[in-house]
Amino acid sequence: MEYIRITSIHDPLFVKMHELMKEVFPPEEVLEFELWKEPLEDSGIRVFAAVHEGDVVGATEYRYYPEWNIAMTDFTIIGRQGLSIGRFLAGNRSKDLTELTRQNGKELFGMFAEIYDPYGIEDHEFGGAKPMNPFVRREVLSHMGYKKLDFPYLHPSWKNDGEAVKGLDFCFMPADEEITEIHAELVINFLTEYYSVLSAKPQDWYTMIEQLKEKEYISLLPL
């Protein structure tokens, strides 16, 4: 299996990856094909495909923020079972992030991720891909060290239509397992930057940010 970076919408691997995304994720979570042009060309956004016998069987997108020394996993797709794709993607992502933080002269503080709460949503099929079942994924991510940030979370739809997307928890995986809380300012700054690409945001999102500004720290809870 190969771990191949994708930097253009014209890459045939991206066509396959985008089709895989549409099979696996709900429509509001998938950015339109043409809108991927700038993100893929952005050196700070790292999109990799797991390629097996010419097919894209998995993919991951993540980014490193040197100013905060944190990372964000945008998504991880496991499109086929029985190939240890999840382990393959996580291992290669970790190696890449270790090198990026080394270049920054630091060790990674931690990594954010949005994780589905399957206990609060009805549709669990995710394109019928068994490894993508939200119940399974949530437990695996908990095993990896992710913890739930203690506040009710929503995010703007990637359709950029101003709708709020719920049914997820905003989570953080600290490099130091002893950490039980993080600065609210870090969360606010990160979310503001992360969703700055979307011009249409729901009022509920702005309200969430304002409520976070009233906090100094946000607790990390078991996932």
Cite the ranges covered by each PLM segment.
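Terminal substrate-recognition subdomain of acyl/acetyltransferases
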Residues: 2, 6-9, 102-223
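Hydrophobic, well-ordered beta-alpha structural blocks that scaffold small-molecule cofactor pockets
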Residues: 59-61, 88, 99-103, 110-112
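Conserved acetyl-CoA-binding loop-helix of GNAT-fold acetyltransferases
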Residues: 82-99, 108
